[in-house]
């Protein structure tokens, strides 16, 4: 487990992180999501013990001061990884030697390169011969070759195309199944991340939030207006709010009209965290994101009815 308690991190007068409590099951694949500046990368550095917080503590497998041997069970991939200024082969030798498994070079290097879609001819390439996308692939492969107990991946799909992103996703799932590896992954690629993750932690302005802010709308005079026929009156305590987040998990969906419902066109359906459906409803010029059980059947383009629960709304501004 990773256990975060009373964590605060400030840069001067600016508060970057403020997390009273967070528990992450590191045997699973956990998504760390949030907009730019939400604190994802900073939290990843703190959880990997690369950066000290201003106050509070992080415990990794019960230890707030993990030994070097314990930290060897963790692999960290940063957004802009740098290779040693040597051949790819020498990079693999260096990382495998650091973990005492250099004798398994052939097996581990071959498997890792294959997982990221590269053949063994890349072992002979020098670092300067690689494109940014190839550098990202090799860096990820170096981490995979370690078969670590836990991976902390910060924007792993940076600089790679859609096809390579899919390979990375398959690699994560393979390592989880084959070696029991756990992952905490921060990424702006929500679609890619939701396809591989089992759990989600959402950050907003350095704080862990109850739900992911997929629905953010402007409000005026206590009203959300999606089109001329779709108007939602907000609870009295939010009448002065100008920006509202709507919890996707607190929207009821129906294929037939229900009391007090609104209607729209079903825009798209995709799997979310492997256990729910992310259903997008088009209403006027807006897309409303909702979550539904994976057992429900929907057809894109059909009329869909929905109703906001009373506790669905959160005032942001």
Where are these regions (language model features)?
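Non-catalytic connector elements of ABC transporters
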Residues: 225-317
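Conserved ABC transporter NBD signature motif
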Residues: 56-70
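Conserved ABC ATPase "signature" region
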Residues: 104-122
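Conserved catalytic motifs of ABC-family nucleotide-binding domains
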Residues: 80-90
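Catalytic Walker B motif of ABC-type/P-loop ATPase nucleotide-binding domains
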Residues: 151-155
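Conserved ABC ATPase signature
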Residues: 126-130
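Helix-to-loop junction immediately C-terminal to a conserved catalytic motif
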Residues: 48
């Amino acid at each position: 487990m990773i256990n975060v308690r009373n964590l605060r991190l400030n840069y001067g007068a600016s508060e970057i992180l403020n997390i009273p409590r967070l528990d992450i099951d590191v045997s699973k694949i956990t998504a760390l999501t949030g907009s730019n500046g939400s604190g994802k990368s900073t939290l990843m550095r703190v959880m990997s013990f690369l950066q000290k917080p201003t106050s509070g503590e992080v415990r990794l497998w019960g230890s707030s001061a993990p030994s070097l041997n314990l930290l060897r069970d963790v692999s960290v991939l940063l957004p802009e990884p740098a290779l040693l200024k040597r051949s790819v082969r020498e990079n693999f030798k260096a990382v495998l030697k650091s973990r005492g498994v250099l004798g398994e070079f052939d097996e581990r290097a071959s498997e890792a390169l294959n997982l990221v879609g590269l053949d063994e001819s890349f072992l002979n390439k020098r670092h300067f011969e690689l494109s940014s996308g190839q550098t990202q692939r090799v860096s990820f492969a170096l981490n995979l070759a370690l078969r670590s107990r836990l991976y902390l991946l910060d924007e792993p799909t940076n600089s790679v195309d859609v096809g390579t992103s899919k390979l990375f996703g398959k690699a994560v799932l393979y390592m989880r199944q084959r070696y029991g590896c756990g992952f905490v992954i921060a990424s702006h690629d929500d679609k890619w991340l939701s396809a591989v993750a089992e759990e989600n932690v959402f950050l907003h302005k350095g704080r862990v939030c109850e739900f992911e802010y997929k629905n953010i709308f402007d409000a005026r005079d206590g009203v959300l207006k999606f089109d001329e026929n779709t108007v939602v009156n907000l609870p009295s305590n939010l009448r002065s709010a100008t920006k509202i987040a709507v919890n996707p998990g607190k929207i009821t969906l129906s294929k037939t009209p229900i009391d007090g419902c609104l209607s729209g066109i079903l825009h798209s359906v995709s799997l979310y965290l492997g256990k729910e459906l992310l259903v997008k409803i088009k209403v006027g010029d807006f897309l409303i994101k909702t979550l539904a059980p994976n057992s429900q059947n929907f057809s894109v383009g059909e009329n869909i009815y929905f109703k906001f629960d009373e506790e669905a709304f959160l005032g942001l501004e």
